[in-house]
């Protein structure tokens, strides 16, 4: 039995609207995308197979919203909201923002593919274009630390797109789920931990230490973002170098303190 028949038949038996549901299941198994209570946005969601999987994984306490130019039939067994519209239009994005709330989405997923022409270079270019559109929407909708999954066809423009995504997230991997057809050039970029920090590693900034952390480090804030500063006391204003910037907090070391050599030299005089 071919891979296509296997997953097609399985989807019919288990009540999924599309065989692609198993791709998302396999990606989730590998990358741990979903948690109970998550808010998920599915871009290009018709016919709804990925919506079904997402709704199962986030449970009744979660929120799942799908958007597509095509109408998506109601999902009787799942509490899913669907929006018919173009995700690149501000009107549709407004509806999406209203649906997910001010906190934003925990996960944005996209299984979109262009209408195939049979001309590989053209199909690849269109695929990357769709993926970039999904990336733009994901950056707008995701909460800090959120995750992004997008399908794209392999080709000459993939590496540049992959690096653009990598620059905005803590971690990126490329996944080829077993449910993909052997003849397909599709891969999925799985990006974890959207980094919206107002600082980056290597930045030198002046901060005021406002609190002390559990491990003894000072804590300063930049636009509400927490930076742990070693060897600094509460109330000190110090110049620091950021050594690591994670989505919700970062680490920095002081660069305004004297060196041991200079201290010894002063004592010698």
Swiss-Prot record:
Signal peptide: none
Positions of the TRAM domain: 198-256
Active-site residues, Swiss-Prot/TrEMBL: 151 (proton acceptor)
EC number: 2.1.1.166
Any single Gene Ontology cellular-component annotation: cytoplasm
Keywords noted in UniProt: Cytoplasm, Methyltransferase, rRNA processing, S-adenosyl-L-methionine, Transferase
GO molecular function: rRNA (uridine-2'-O-)-methyltransferase activity
Subcellular location: Cytoplasm
Catalytic reaction(s) noted: uridine(2552) in 23S rRNA + S-adenosyl-L-methionine = 2'-O-methyluridine(2552) in 23S rRNA + S-adenosyl-L-homocysteine + H(+)
Chain positions recorded as S-adenosyl-L-methionine binding sites: 48, 50, 68, 86, 111
Role noted for this protein: Specifically methylates the uridine in position 2552 of 23S rRNA at the 2'-O position of the ribose in the fully assembled 50S ribosomal subunit.
HAMAP family: RNA_methyltr_E (MF_01547)
Family designation: Belongs to the class I-like SAM-binding methyltransferase superfamily. RNA methyltransferase RlmE family.
Name of the protein: Ribosomal RNA large subunit methyltransferase E
Gene: rlmE
